[in-house]
């Protein structure tokens, strides 16, 4: 069988929090307010209020909880808008989101940025494998929380996060996979074909935080690449083994890249948004 690193129950709790956040964000942004949809929103909100305060890393070397904190903040921001006019509910949602910011601060890597593994030192503050895409995910969540709910963010960690993304970028605006990959920029996963689904997230994260380096033209180039080279990540989409196909793409890259591609499209003038 295929060995998956997912220590129970922590890893399962983290993935459930992250996937629930993504689903709830999508439902709320869809504008669907049929009775059965509203019931699902209420149920997910109650689950978040109960479970997110309990979310921690599963073991000292696996920090999948970072995904739950990040997508939890984004879902809470959408709930905050949904509860407009209900001051008590909005206050509870904001307070919960602020605790998630503190958890992200706790799990920031000593090198700057965020990752989800620490196989070597196993320290209280991670010293392991911060990755470009996990850092971009966190930075997008922090930005959304600040813009929508006025969350207080840790300035040092925010600055270090942006600087980490810059260090991961190669001259063609591919982003290497993780911190140690900076020394192997032409390894297959770090080439443009392996960065198709990371560059969307990293480019938009830098832009929303005021970094002008990923220009509109660069954003468009990488959106075009994602569309034209779709086959490479589509092949990976149903492969059970991670990084087993062209340019070491994994199945989840397919969905991750498209999720942030929509944010990239929103950066562009309306005249440039059509394919």
Task: Tell where the protein language model's regions lie, with residue ranges.
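Preference for long, amphipathic alpha-helical scaffolds in soluble/luminal domains
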Residues: 1-275
